[in-house]
Protein backbone atom coordinates (compact mmCIF):
# COMPACT_ATOMS: atom_id res chain seq x y z
CA UNK A 1 0.00 0.00 0.00
CA UNK A 2 1.39 3.40 -0.94
CA UNK A 3 1.95 5.83 1.89
CA UNK A 4 1.20 9.54 1.91
CA UNK A 5 4.11 11.84 2.55
CA UNK A 6 4.19 13.75 5.86
CA UNK A 7 3.27 16.97 4.07
CA UNK A 8 0.34 15.36 2.26
CA UNK A 9 -0.86 13.75 5.50
CA UNK A 10 -0.87 17.09 7.30
CA UNK A 11 -2.76 18.70 4.44
CA UNK A 12 -5.26 15.81 4.46
CA UNK A 13 -5.86 16.46 8.18
CA UNK A 14 -6.84 20.07 7.41
CA UNK A 15 -3.64 21.99 8.16
CA UNK A 16 -2.85 24.81 5.71
CA UNK A 17 -0.08 23.89 3.31
CA UNK A 18 2.19 26.77 4.31
CA UNK A 19 1.80 25.98 8.02
CA UNK A 20 2.44 22.26 7.41
CA UNK A 21 5.58 22.96 5.37
CA UNK A 22 6.83 25.34 8.06
CA UNK A 23 6.25 22.75 10.80
CA UNK A 24 8.16 20.07 8.91
CA UNK A 25 10.98 22.47 8.13
CA UNK A 26 11.42 23.71 11.69
CA UNK A 27 11.35 20.19 13.13
CA UNK A 28 14.07 19.05 10.74
CA UNK A 29 11.68 16.89 8.70
CA UNK A 30 11.66 14.30 11.51
CA UNK A 31 8.19 13.02 10.76
CA UNK A 32 4.55 13.81 11.13
CA UNK A 33 4.40 13.45 14.93
CA UNK A 34 7.11 16.04 15.51
CA UNK A 35 5.44 18.37 13.02
CA UNK A 36 2.04 17.89 14.71
CA UNK A 37 3.55 18.65 18.12
CA UNK A 38 5.00 21.87 16.75
CA UNK A 39 1.70 22.84 15.09
CA UNK A 40 -0.30 22.36 18.28
CA UNK A 41 2.23 24.21 20.43
CA UNK A 42 2.40 27.19 18.06
CA UNK A 43 -1.16 27.37 16.72
CA UNK A 44 -1.80 30.60 18.63
CA UNK A 45 1.45 32.31 17.57
CA UNK A 46 0.77 35.50 15.59
CA UNK A 47 3.48 34.63 13.04
CA UNK A 48 2.60 30.96 12.61
CA UNK A 49 1.53 31.50 8.99
CA UNK A 50 4.45 33.68 7.99
CA UNK A 51 6.67 31.91 5.40
CA UNK A 52 10.28 31.01 6.05
CA UNK A 53 12.98 32.87 4.15
CA UNK A 54 14.79 29.63 3.17
CA UNK A 55 12.99 27.72 0.38
CA UNK A 56 10.93 25.03 2.04
CA UNK A 57 11.75 22.50 -0.68
CA UNK A 58 15.41 22.58 0.36
CA UNK A 59 14.62 22.21 4.05
CA UNK A 60 12.04 19.49 3.56
CA UNK A 61 14.34 17.56 1.26
CA UNK A 62 11.64 16.98 -1.36
CA UNK A 63 12.34 16.90 -5.07
CA UNK A 64 11.67 20.13 -6.94
CA UNK A 65 8.45 20.26 -8.93
CA UNK A 66 8.62 20.02 -12.74
CA UNK A 67 8.17 23.78 -12.94
CA UNK A 68 11.24 24.27 -10.67
CA UNK A 69 13.51 22.12 -12.85
CA UNK A 70 15.71 23.79 -15.47
CA UNK A 71 16.61 22.37 -18.86
CA UNK A 72 15.32 19.54 -20.94
CA UNK A 73 17.08 16.96 -18.76
CA UNK A 74 15.04 18.03 -15.76
CA UNK A 75 11.71 17.85 -17.52
CA UNK A 76 12.57 14.52 -19.06
CA UNK A 77 13.52 12.98 -15.73
CA UNK A 78 10.32 14.32 -14.12
CA UNK A 79 8.21 12.87 -16.87
CA UNK A 80 9.94 9.51 -16.59
CA UNK A 81 9.11 9.08 -12.89
CA UNK A 82 5.65 8.04 -11.77
CA UNK A 83 4.34 8.71 -8.23
CA UNK A 84 2.35 5.93 -6.55
CA UNK A 85 -1.33 6.77 -6.44
CA UNK A 86 -3.37 5.86 -3.33
CA UNK A 87 -6.74 4.28 -3.72
CA UNK A 88 -9.67 5.96 -2.01
CA UNK A 89 -9.78 3.25 0.64
CA UNK A 90 -6.06 3.61 1.38
CA UNK A 91 -6.37 7.36 1.58
CA UNK A 92 -9.28 7.12 4.02
CA UNK A 93 -7.43 4.58 6.20
CA UNK A 94 -4.33 6.71 6.38
CA UNK A 95 -6.36 9.83 7.11
CA UNK A 96 -8.15 7.96 9.90
CA UNK A 97 -4.84 7.02 11.50
CA UNK A 98 -3.63 10.59 11.30
CA UNK A 99 -6.85 11.94 12.83
CA UNK A 100 -6.56 9.46 15.70
CA UNK A 101 -3.02 10.65 16.25
CA UNK A 102 -4.19 14.27 16.24
CA UNK A 103 -6.92 13.43 18.76
CA UNK A 104 -4.41 11.69 21.01
CA UNK A 105 -2.06 14.67 20.86
CA UNK A 106 -4.97 16.98 21.64
CA UNK A 107 -5.96 14.90 24.67
CA UNK A 108 -2.39 14.90 25.94
CA UNK A 109 -2.23 18.66 25.52
CA UNK A 110 -5.54 19.19 27.37
CA UNK A 111 -4.43 16.93 30.22
CA UNK A 112 -1.16 18.83 30.49
CA UNK A 113 -2.94 22.18 30.53
CA UNK A 114 -5.38 20.88 33.15
CA UNK A 115 -2.51 19.76 35.38
CA UNK A 116 -0.80 23.12 34.98
CA UNK A 117 -4.03 24.97 35.81
CA UNK A 118 -4.53 22.80 38.89
CA UNK A 119 -0.98 23.50 40.03
CA UNK A 120 -1.48 27.25 39.52
CA UNK A 121 -4.67 27.11 41.60
CA UNK A 122 -2.86 25.24 44.38
CA UNK A 123 -0.10 27.83 44.29
CA UNK A 124 -2.65 30.68 44.44
CA UNK A 125 -4.43 29.12 47.43
CA UNK A 126 -1.14 28.46 49.19
CA UNK A 127 -0.07 32.07 48.74
CA UNK A 128 -3.48 33.26 49.95
CA UNK A 129 -3.22 31.13 53.09
CA UNK A 130 0.29 32.40 53.78
CA UNK A 131 -0.86 36.00 53.35
CA UNK A 132 -3.86 35.43 55.63
CA UNK A 133 -1.64 33.83 58.27
CA UNK A 134 0.79 36.76 58.10
CA UNK A 135 -2.05 39.27 58.53
CA UNK A 136 -3.47 37.33 61.48
CA UNK A 137 -0.06 37.19 63.15
CA UNK A 138 0.36 40.93 62.66
CA UNK A 139 -3.03 41.59 64.26
CA UNK A 140 -2.23 39.29 67.17
CA UNK A 141 1.10 41.04 67.72
CA UNK A 142 -0.62 44.44 67.73
CA UNK A 143 -3.26 43.23 70.20
CA UNK A 144 -0.59 41.76 72.45
CA UNK A 145 1.46 44.96 72.39
CA UNK A 146 -1.63 47.04 73.20
CA UNK A 147 -2.53 44.73 76.11
CA UNK A 148 1.02 44.91 77.46
CA UNK A 149 0.95 48.70 77.22
CA UNK A 150 -2.37 48.84 79.12
CA UNK A 151 -1.02 46.52 81.81
CA UNK A 152 2.12 48.61 82.16
CA UNK A 153 0.16 51.87 82.45
CA UNK A 154 -2.19 50.33 85.01
CA UNK A 155 0.73 48.98 87.03
CA UNK A 156 2.36 52.42 87.02
CA UNK A 157 -0.89 54.04 88.11
CA UNK A 158 -1.37 51.50 90.92
CA UNK A 159 2.22 52.01 92.04
CA UNK A 160 1.70 55.78 92.12
CA UNK A 161 -1.47 55.38 94.17
CA UNK A 162 0.32 53.04 96.56
CA UNK A 163 3.10 55.56 97.05
CA UNK A 164 0.55 58.26 97.86
CA UNK A 165 -1.25 55.99 100.34
CA UNK A 166 2.01 55.05 102.03
CA UNK A 167 2.95 58.72 102.29
CA UNK A 168 -0.41 59.53 103.87
CA UNK A 169 -0.04 56.69 106.36
CA UNK A 170 3.43 57.85 107.31
CA UNK A 171 2.19 61.38 107.87
CA UNK A 172 -0.68 60.12 110.00
CA UNK A 173 1.69 58.04 112.10
CA UNK A 174 4.03 60.97 112.59
CA UNK A 175 1.18 63.25 113.65
CA UNK A 176 -0.24 60.65 116.04
CA UNK A 177 3.16 60.08 117.61
CA UNK A 178 3.75 63.80 118.05
CA UNK A 179 0.27 64.47 119.40
CA UNK A 180 0.44 61.56 121.89
CA UNK A 181 3.80 62.65 123.25
CA UNK A 182 2.52 66.18 123.97
CA UNK A 183 -0.48 64.93 125.91
CA UNK A 184 1.60 62.50 128.01
CA UNK A 185 4.09 65.19 129.07
CA UNK A 186 1.47 67.44 130.68
CA UNK A 187 1.27 67.36 134.50
CA UNK A 188 -1.93 66.10 136.12
CA UNK A 189 -3.88 68.42 138.50
CA UNK A 190 -3.02 68.34 142.28
CA UNK A 191 -4.74 65.59 144.27
CA UNK A 192 -5.93 68.11 146.91
CA UNK A 193 -8.18 69.78 144.36
CA UNK A 194 -11.57 68.13 145.00
CA UNK A 195 -13.02 68.48 141.55
CA UNK A 196 -11.24 70.65 139.07
CA UNK A 197 -13.04 71.44 135.89
CA UNK A 198 -11.11 69.59 133.20
CA UNK A 199 -9.64 71.95 130.72
CA UNK A 200 -9.60 71.11 127.05
CA UNK A 201 -6.23 69.85 125.89
CA UNK A 202 -4.07 72.43 124.27
CA UNK A 203 -4.16 71.96 120.52
CA UNK A 204 -0.86 71.93 118.76
CA UNK A 205 -0.79 73.99 115.59
CA UNK A 206 -1.13 71.67 112.60
CA UNK A 207 2.13 70.76 111.00
CA UNK A 208 2.35 71.90 107.41
CA UNK A 209 2.69 68.82 105.29
CA UNK A 210 5.09 68.64 102.42
CA UNK A 211 3.82 66.61 99.48
CA UNK A 212 6.16 65.32 96.83
CA UNK A 213 3.39 64.30 94.43
CA UNK A 214 0.04 65.63 93.30
CA UNK A 215 -2.86 64.06 91.47
CA UNK A 216 -4.34 66.15 88.68
CA UNK A 217 -7.70 65.45 87.02
CA UNK A 218 -8.21 67.28 83.72
CA UNK A 219 -11.69 67.68 82.25
CA UNK A 220 -11.75 67.90 78.46
CA UNK A 221 -14.26 69.88 76.36
CA UNK A 222 -15.95 66.67 75.12
CA UNK A 223 -16.87 65.64 78.68
CA UNK A 224 -14.14 63.04 79.18
CA UNK A 225 -11.39 63.41 81.72
CA UNK A 226 -7.73 62.52 82.15
CA UNK A 227 -6.10 61.68 85.48
CA UNK A 228 -2.37 61.59 86.10
CA UNK A 229 0.06 61.89 89.01
CA UNK A 230 2.83 64.51 88.75
CA UNK A 231 5.70 65.51 90.98
CA UNK A 232 4.88 68.51 93.16
CA UNK A 233 7.84 70.44 91.79
CA UNK A 234 6.96 69.84 88.13
CA UNK A 235 5.92 72.87 86.14
CA UNK A 236 2.34 73.42 85.02
CA UNK A 237 3.65 73.12 81.45
CA UNK A 238 4.09 69.37 82.08
CA UNK A 239 0.33 69.07 82.68
CA UNK A 240 -0.44 71.00 79.51
CA UNK A 241 1.93 68.79 77.49
CA UNK A 242 0.30 65.65 78.92
CA UNK A 243 -3.15 66.95 77.89
CA UNK A 244 -1.97 67.79 74.37
CA UNK A 245 -0.56 64.27 73.95
CA UNK A 246 -3.58 62.40 75.35
CA UNK A 247 -6.68 64.41 74.46
CA UNK A 248 -7.65 61.91 71.76
CA UNK A 249 -7.30 63.92 68.56
CA UNK A 250 -6.19 62.15 65.38
CA UNK A 251 -2.45 62.33 64.65
CA UNK A 252 -1.62 64.83 61.97
CA UNK A 253 -4.62 67.10 62.68
CA UNK A 254 -4.05 70.72 63.60
CA UNK A 255 -4.54 70.91 67.36
CA UNK A 256 -5.86 74.05 69.03
CA UNK A 257 -3.76 75.54 71.83
CA UNK A 258 -4.74 74.40 75.31
CA UNK A 259 -5.96 76.88 77.97
CA UNK A 260 -6.00 75.50 81.55
CA UNK A 261 -8.51 76.78 84.10
CA UNK A 262 -9.08 75.96 87.74
CA UNK A 263 -12.64 75.23 88.80
CA UNK A 264 -12.77 76.83 92.25
CA UNK A 265 -11.69 79.45 92.73
CA UNK A 266 -12.05 80.26 89.04
CA UNK A 267 -8.68 81.07 87.55
CA UNK A 268 -7.17 81.07 84.08
CA UNK A 269 -3.50 80.14 84.06
CA UNK A 270 -1.24 82.35 81.95
CA UNK A 271 1.90 81.51 80.01
CA UNK A 272 3.93 82.77 82.96
CA UNK A 273 2.12 80.29 85.21
CA UNK A 274 3.27 77.47 82.94
CA UNK A 275 6.81 77.95 84.26
CA UNK A 276 5.74 77.76 87.92
CA UNK A 277 5.72 74.48 89.90
CA UNK A 278 2.43 72.83 90.79
CA UNK A 279 3.19 73.21 94.49
CA UNK A 280 3.53 76.97 94.16
CA UNK A 281 0.25 77.24 92.23
CA UNK A 282 -1.67 75.52 95.04
CA UNK A 283 -2.43 72.36 93.03
CA UNK A 284 -0.90 69.97 95.60
CA UNK A 285 -1.89 67.32 96.73
CA UNK A 286 -4.77 67.16 94.21
CA UNK A 287 -6.63 69.47 91.89
CA UNK A 288 -9.18 69.54 89.09
CA UNK A 289 -8.36 71.53 85.97
CA UNK A 290 -10.58 72.39 83.02
CA UNK A 291 -9.39 72.53 79.41
CA UNK A 292 -10.65 75.32 77.21
CA UNK A 293 -9.61 76.11 73.66
CA UNK A 294 -7.25 79.03 73.67
CA UNK A 295 -8.32 81.89 71.44
CA UNK A 296 -5.54 82.87 69.06
CA UNK A 297 -4.13 86.28 69.85
Swiss-Prot record:
Residues 209-291 form the UBX domain. The keyword Phosphoprotein applies. Residues 86-172 form a coiled coil. It holds the Pfam family UBA_7. PROSITE patterns: UBA (PS50030), UBX (PS50033). The modification Phosphothreonine is found at residues 207, 229. Residues 2-42 form the UBA domain. One of its GO terms (molecular function) is ubiquitin protein ligase binding. Residues 86-122, 137-177 have a biased composition (Basic and acidic residues). Residues 42-52 have a biased composition (Acidic residues). Keywords: Acetylation, Coiled coil, Cytoplasm, Phosphoprotein. Residues 38-212 are annotated as: Disordered. The modification Phosphoserine is found at residues 199-200, 270. It is found in: Cytoplasm. Residues 43-297 are annotated as: Interaction with BRCA1. Its main location: cytoplasm. It comes from the Eukaryota. One of its GO terms (cellular component) is VCP-NPL4-UFD1 AAA ATPase complex. GO terms for biological process: negative regulation of ERAD pathway; negative regulation of proteasomal ubiquitin-dependent protein catabolic process; negative regulation of protein K48-linked deubiquitination; negative regulation of protein ubiquitination. PANTHER family: UBX DOMAIN-CONTAINING PROTEIN 1. Component of a complex required to couple retrotranslocation, ubiquitination and deglycosylation composed of NGLY1, SAKS1, AMFR, VCP and RAD23B. Interacts with HOMER2. Interacts directly with VCP. Interacts with BRCA1 and BARD1; interaction takes place when BRCA1 is not autoubiquitinated bur is strongly enhanced in the presence of autoubiquitinated BRCA1. Ubiquitin-binding protein that interacts with the BRCA1-BARD1 heterodimer, and regulates its activity. Specifically binds 'Lys-6'-linked polyubiquitin chains. Interaction with autoubiquitinated BRCA1, leads to inhibit the E3 ubiquitin-protein ligase activity of the BRCA1-BARD1 heterodimer. Component of a complex required to couple deglycosylation and proteasome-mediated degradation of misfolded proteins in the endoplasmic reticulum that are retrotranslocated in the cytosol. This is UBX domain-containing protein 1. It comes from Rattus norvegicus (Rat).
